[in-house]
Design a protein with these regions (language model features):
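A Zn2+-metalloprotease active-site environment signal
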Residues: 6-21, 25-230
Length: 230
């Protein structure tokens, strides 16, 4: 995956080294589970292998979570800025065409623990989006764990995770998050294979696919032919 020439986003905040240490439980959150399954499907990885990865990540083993300050020349942060910039370019072109202005989220890089608009969180949760402050939170250690368990994921797999979380921001801008919240309060089923939680995550995967397609094939023709068919 070539990303070196991509525009770097200014909407990345690096607070690594500012969080507290301690120990957490190794647990892959629900959104992270769907994102990892989506990556496996795209890369042609056996679903049983993916389930093995999630079982390992969800083992409940204590994992040390120490905050470390980033190096001065941080290639990982540069990669994240490039991918966030790509998602900004894609969605700032697609959403206004549907009458929805696009305001990009801020992606927060943290290590160990972080305080979000949705409350305190640790790296054990995996990457997540908080609609209250419209921010994506990412501990880069998630990529290391995913790479170690999969035997290699690469830049595309990492970028897909970021695009998936940005997909939740797109849902928020489209009012989908609010509609799901209203449905939950009305007693609609959230859990299970047909539940709204799974559907919400699968749609975020779909939006990540929009990014993946347009970064390689361009926006113009696909935007008119496909995005409008909702």
């Amino acid at each position: 995956m070539k990303w070196g020439d991509a525009r770097r986003s200014d909407n990345v905040e690096d607070v690594r080294g500012a969080g507290g240490g301690g120990f957490g439980l190794r647990h892959l959150g629900f959104g992270g589970t769907i994102a990892v399954l989506g990556i496996g499907w795209l890369l042609g990885i056996n679903p049983l292998q993916m389930l093995g990865l999630m079982s390992a990540l969800d083992s409940g083993a204590p994992v040390p979570q120490q905050g470390h300050a980033p190096p001065g020349n941080d290639a990982q942060a540069d990669f994240v800025r490039a991918i966030v910039g790509e998602t900004e370019d894609v969605w700032s072109a697609l959403l206004p065409a549907q009458g929805v202005p696009y305001s990009p989220p801020t992606l927060v890089l943290f290590s160990g623990r972080v305080q979000s608009g949705c409350g305190g969180a640790s790296a054990a949760m995996g990457p997540f989006y908080c609609p209250n402050d419209q921010r994506v939170y990412l501990d880069m250690g998630f990529f290391d764990e995913m790479r170690a368990q999969l035997g290699g994921g690469g830049d595309f797999a990492n970028a897909y995770v970021i695009a998936h979380e940005v997909g939740h921001h797109v849902q928020n801008l489209l009012g989908i998050e609010d509609r799901v919240t209203q449905a939950r309060r009305a007693g609609q089923r959230m859990q299970g294979g047909e539940g709204l939680s799974v559907r919400l995550e699968l749609q975020a995967d779909c939006f990540a696919g929009v990014w993946a397609y347009t970064r390689s094939s361009g926006i113009t023709g696909w935007k008119r032919a496909t995005w409008s068919r909702r």
